[in-house]
Amino acid sequence: LPSISFSADPTSQLINNNVTLSWSSSNANSCSASGSWSGTKTTAGTEIVQITGVGNNSFTLSCSGSGGNRSSTVTVEGYRETDGVVVDGYISGAEVCIDENSNFLCDSSEFSTTSDNDGKFKLRYVDGSLVSIGGTDLDSQIILENYLISHKMTGYTEFKVVTPVTSVASFLCTNNGTCDGSGANINTILGIDNSVDIYTFDPVANRGD
């Protein structure tokens, strides 16, 4: 039977970016691809492929020889990133994470980063709540030791804000957007115009509006 050595580098990649597939075989005279790639392949080689899907992207290589057929599959996990900004005045140097277990801490197993000098951050997206801890208020230059604000995410979007208002919504509102048991939304409760999306609205960038 043919034998196949088949690998992907890296095995986890941001979608719309590339990975390198490498393979070699013995006792084979032809190979073909299936799954997340396709076509006839040489019995040994490398190929750069784009990761297009979130979750598992499976690549299968099947090789044939006089002794029969053999297949091998490698899987690459595709993921997305979410951008955002921490605002109560922009907050730099805050630890920002996606809290997956709802303990309002940035555990070592959770994806985390530090907000930059404009309060901005970028994180690998998973389901959970954005939590910002500490940092420095860029308006007042006050160090916000252990200051915590959050944003309960209900799905993927490319940009999110973490503000005191999103923190209130995290505690008062359900995932369907109703709050405090009354069926009202957070905008109504806080007297904010319903045209404002509190989860993406940057209050500093829109001062005076």
For each of these PLM feature ranges, what is it?
Residues 11-17:
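Short, solvent-exposed loop/linker segments at the N-terminal edge
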Residues 1-8:
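Proline-enriched interdomain boundary motifs that mark the N-terminal boundary
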Residues 41-58:
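Solvent-exposed segments in extracellular or luminal domains encompassing
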